[in-house]
C-alpha cells in the first residue's frame, strides 16, 4: 500500500476552494482544510465577512469529514501588505494588494505553516492556474532557499517549475500568482487547473455545497467591503486637499481630498461639473491632480514603462532575453484586460523596460507588469517609471514644428 500523501488546502469559504478540497479527497489524499484570517473586522462594523466565510469553510470540511484549522495572519497582513499599500498610495502610486498578499501571506507564511506546522507534503489552493508538474512530482520536491543573486547557481541542476494559465482563460488567476516563489510553487497543487468555473459549480451542486454556491463571487478588496474607496482610505491617511488641474490649459477645475484617493484613468468627481473628466497624472509635491476632458484623451495613453527588479517565476530570465537583451512576448497590468503584444528589454540591474505595440490606457506606477510567453506566466515587476503619454509626445512634436517654422521665417530662402 502506498504512502498516504498529506495535502493542506487553503479554504476561503468560497466555491473554488471547497471544490478543490473535495477533489483532493477524491484523489485519495489525506486533506486538511485551513482558513486564513488576514483582516481584523471587529472595528469594521461587519463589512468584511471573514467570520461567515470561516463558518462556511468549516461546514465544507465537516461535510467532507476532513480536519479543519483556522490560522490568523492579521499581524503579518498589516505589516507586509496593508502598510505597504498605504505607503504606496501616499506616494501617488496604485498598488495591487492581491498580488502582494499571495506573495507574502498565502505562498510564504501559509505555505510554511502547512509544511512546518501541519507536516504537509504539499499545499493546495483554489486558483485557476496550472504548473508544469504532474501531481506526483510535487511530492518529490525538496525544500530549498530562494537564490540571493539575480540568476540562480548555474551549476545547480534543477529544472524550474513553470506557471501556466488554467483551462478557463476567462477565470485565469496567474496574474495574481506572478510574484510567488519557485519553492512555494514546487509544493503547490491547483486542483482546478483543468476545469471551467461552470463545471466547478456543477461539482459543488452535486456535492451539496449550497451554502457556498449561493454566495456572490468576491470582487475587489475584502477589507474595504461595500464602502467607497475614498472614505475607506481616509480612515488611515490624513486628508491632503489639492486642486484638479486641466492638463490642457492649466485651469483649476475643482478640489479633491487627497491624491491617494485617485488612480490614473478613473473618472474624477469634480463638484459642480456635469461633464466627465479623468485623472491623467498626480504631483504629490503640490497635491495637484491633472485631469483631461475625455476617456479617450491622448494624455491617458502611453506605450512604455520600466519595472523594478523583475521577479522571474523560473528564477531567471528566459534564455532568449539573456542572450539578446530583448524579447517579444505579451503583457498586462490589470487582470481584467486582454494580453497585449510587447517587446521587453532586460537591464543590468534586473529591471525591465516594456514597450507595447499599441499605447494603453491608464497605466500607473505601483501596478504590476505581468509578462506571458504563450500560456506561460513568466513573472512580474512593479512599475516604477512610465514613458511619455501620447499627449506629451504630440505637444513635443507641435513645439518642434513651431520651432522649425520660426527658424525658417528668420532665415528665409534667398530669391533666385
Swiss-Prot record:
Enzyme Commission numbers on file: 2.8.1.14
Q: Family, per the entry? A: Belongs to the MnmA/TRMU family.
What remark does the entry add? During the reaction, ATP is used to activate the C2 atom of U34 by adenylation. After this, the persulfide sulfur on the catalytic cysteine is transferred to the C2 atom of the wobble base (U34) of mitochondrial tRNA(Lys), tRNA(Glu) and tRNA(Gln). The reaction probably involves hydrogen sulfide that is generated from the persulfide intermediate and that acts as a nucleophile towards the activated C2 atom on U34. Subsequently, a transient disulfide bond is formed between the two active site cysteine residues.
GO molecular function annotation: ATP binding; tRNA binding; tRNA-5-taurinomethyluridine 2-sulfurtransferase
Gene behind this protein: trmu
Protein location: Mitochondrion
Function statement? Catalyzes the 2-thiolation of uridine at the wobble position (U34) of mitochondrial tRNA(Lys), tRNA(Glu) and tRNA(Gln). Required for the formation of 5-taurinomethyl-2-thiouridine (tm5s2U) of mitochondrial tRNA(Lys), tRNA(Glu), and tRNA(Gln) at the wobble position. ATP is required to activate the C2 atom of the wobble base.
Matching InterPro entries: MnmA-like, MnmA-like_C, MnmA-like_central, MnmA-like_central_sf, Rossmann-like_a/b/a_fold
Reactions accelerated catalytically: 5-taurinomethyluridine(34) in tRNA + S-sulfanyl-L-cysteinyl-[protein] + AH2 + ATP = 5-taurinomethyl-2-thiouridine(34) in tRNA + L-cysteinyl-[protein] + A + AMP + diphosphate + H(+)
Q: What is this protein called?
A: Mitochondrial tRNA-specific 2-thiouridylase 1
Provide the organism lineage as a comma list: Eukaryota, Metazoa, Chordata, Craniata, Vertebrata
Site positions for Interaction with tRNA: 127, 267, 367
- Entry keywords, A to Z: ATP-binding, Disulfide bond, Mitochondrion, Nucleotide-binding, RNA-binding, Transferase, tRNA processing, tRNA-binding
Organism the protein comes from: Danio rerio
Amino acid at each position: 500500500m502506498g504512502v498516504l500523501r498529506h495535502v493542506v488546502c487553503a479554504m476561503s469559504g468560497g466555491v473554488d476552494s471547497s471544490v478543490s478540497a473535495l477533489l483532493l479527497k477524491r484523489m485519495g489524499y489525506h486533506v486538511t482544510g485551513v482558513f486564513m484570517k488576514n483582516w481584523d473586522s471587529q472595528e469594521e462594523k461587519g463589512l468584511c465577512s471573514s467570520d461567515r466565510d470561516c463558518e462556511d469553510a468549516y461546514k465544507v470540511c465537516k461535510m467532507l469529514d476532513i480536519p479543519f484549522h483556522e490560522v490568523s495572519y492579521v499581524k503579518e497582513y498589516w505589516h507586509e501588505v496593508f502598510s505597504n499599500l498605504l505607503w504606496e498610495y501616499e506616494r501617488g502610486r496604485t498598488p495591487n494588494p492581491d498580488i502582494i498578499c499571495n506573495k507574502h501571506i498565502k505562498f510564504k507564511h501559509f505555505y510554511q505553516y502547512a509544511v512546518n506546522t501541519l507536516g504537509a507534503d504539499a499545499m493546495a489552493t483554489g486558483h485557476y492556474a496550472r504548473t508544469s508538474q504532474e501531481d506526483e512530482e510535487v511530492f518529490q520536491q525538496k525544500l530549498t532557499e530562494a537564490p540571493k543573486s539575480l540568476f540562480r547557481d548555474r551549476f545547480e541542476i534543477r529544472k524550474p517549475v513553470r506557471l501556466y494559465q488554467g483551462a478557463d482563460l476567462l477565470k485565469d488567476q496567474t496574474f495574481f500568482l506572478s510574484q510567488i516563489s519557485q519553492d512555494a510553487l514546487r509544493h503547490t497543487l491547483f486542483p482546478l487547473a483543468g476545469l471551467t468555473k461552470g463545471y466547478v459549480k456543477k461539482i459543488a451542486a452535486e456535492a451539496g455545497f449550497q451554502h457556498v454556491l449561493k454566495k456572490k463571487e468576491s470582487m475587489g478588496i475584502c477589507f474595504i467591503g461595500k464602502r467607497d474607496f475614498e472614505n475607506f482610505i481616509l480612515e488611515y491617511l490624513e486628508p491632503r486637499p489639492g486642486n484638479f488641474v486641466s492638463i490642457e490649459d492649466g485651469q483649476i477645475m475643482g478640489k479633491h481630498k487627497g491624491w491617494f484617493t485617485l488612480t490614473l484613468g478613473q473618472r474624477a468627481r469634480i463638484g459642480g461639473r456635469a461633464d466627465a473628466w479623468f485623472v491623467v497624472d498626480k504631483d504629490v509635491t503640490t497635491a495637484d491632480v491633472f485631469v483631461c476632458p475625455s476617456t479617450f484623451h491622448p494624455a491617458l495613453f502611453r506605450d512604455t514603462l520600466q519595472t523594478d527588479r523583475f521577479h522571474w517565476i523560473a528564477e531567471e530570465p528566459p534564455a532568449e532575453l539573456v542572450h539578446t537583451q530583448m524579447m517579444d512576448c505579451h503583457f498586462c497590468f490589470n487582470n481584467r484586460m486582454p494580453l497585449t503584444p510587447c517587446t521587453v528589454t532586460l537591464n543590468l540591474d534586473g529591471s525591465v523596460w516594456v514597450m507595447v505595440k499599441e499605447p494603453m490606457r491608464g497605466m500607473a506606477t505601483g501596478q504590476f507588469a505581468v509578462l506571458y510567453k504563450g500560456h506561460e506566466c513568466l513573472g512580474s515587476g512593479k512599475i516604477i517609471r512610465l514613458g511619455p503619454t501620447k499627449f506629451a509626445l504630440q505637444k513635443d512634436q507641435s513645439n518642434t514644428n513651431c520651432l522649425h517654422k520660426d527658424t525658417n521665417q528668420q532665415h528665409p530662402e534667398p530669391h533666385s
